[in-house]
Amino acid sequence: MRKYQEEIINALGVNSQIDPQAEVTKRVQFICDFLQTTKMKALVLGISGGQDSSLAGRLSQLAVEKLREETGDNEYQFIAVRLPYGEQADESDAMFAINDFIKPDKIMRVNIKAATDAMVASLNEAGTPISDFSKGNIKARERMIVQYAIGGENKGAVVGTDHAAEAVTGFYTKFGDGGADITPLSGLDKRQGKALLQYLGAPAKLYDKTPTADLEEDKPMRPDEEALGVRYDEIDDYLEGREVSPAAAEKIESWYRRTQHKRHLPIAPYDTWWK
């Protein structure tokens, strides 16, 4: 195993082998403990219909159901949120995940197109033209604004979908989908998340769907693997301590170095990690 590979695995808390049943039990209890300790009553999560939000959503629903049963407090709830920019190409996938697998207590829909377009227009008027890439990040941050607004009105916490295969590459928007109060998938790689979904009886289409951030209008539904330049199977092998090609290892390690800032709080005068 490469020395840096071992450091990354330890930093992200990845185990080479997991028991899906034990992981589900542990992560549901983690969510329950968080809610009881913080005195919050709700969980809020944007649902895209892909593997990560489907898994985080189902774990969240199981957690609030467990708390209601154990405490008799029916205030505990999970709110699944659809956050389309206009008409989303994968809308049917998202609704399938919500209705057929996650089965949340409450479903909300907030279209972020007007807010996003207004922000872009205002920036253009201020003399700062916005690229399609930057507009994609604005979309991600608008979605998080909505989720925190819903959470604030419902004594709720925002659930993040970050996991080890995403964290190692920093493949998320800083203060967008990277912003959350609790990340129940942390430490899992992509294939381990799939194993949890299979244990939970999820339909195959939820974990076989090609992962995509789908933020750029110039490149709609662009696969994550195309943007990253490395396959998730290679990322998972790397995180599980297996040997991967030198090219794949170097690509993963390059992403990890370049995105360190996303895995830290804002840099303070006494911080040294960035130097």
UniProtKB/Swiss-Prot annotation:
Q: Which reaction does it catalyse?
A: deamido-NAD(+) + NH4(+) + ATP = AMP + diphosphate + NAD(+) + H(+)
Under InterPro entries, the record lists: NAD/GMP_synthase, NAD_synthase, NH(3)-dep_NAD(+)_synth, Rossmann-like_a/b/a_fold
Q: Quote the record's binding site residues for ATP.
A: G46, I47, S48, G49, G50, Q51, D52, S53, T161, K190, T212
Per UniProt, which keywords does this protein have? ATP-binding, Ligase, Magnesium, Metal-binding, NAD, Nucleotide-binding
Q: Return the broad EC class.
A: ligase
Q: Which residues bind deamido-NAD(+)?
A: R141, K174, D181, H261, K262
Q: Name one GO cellular component term.
A: cytoplasm
Q: In which pathway does it act?
A: Cofactor biosynthesis; NAD(+) biosynthesis; NAD(+) from deamido-NAD(+) (ammonia route): step 1/1
**In the UniProt record, does the keyword Membrane occur?**
no
**What are the boundaries of the signal sequence?**
none
> What exactly does this protein do?
Catalyzes the ATP-dependent amidation of deamido-NAD to form NAD. Uses ammonia as a nitrogen source.
What is the similarity comment for this entry? Belongs to the NAD synthetase family.
Q: What is this protein called?
A: NH(3)-dependent NAD(+) synthetase
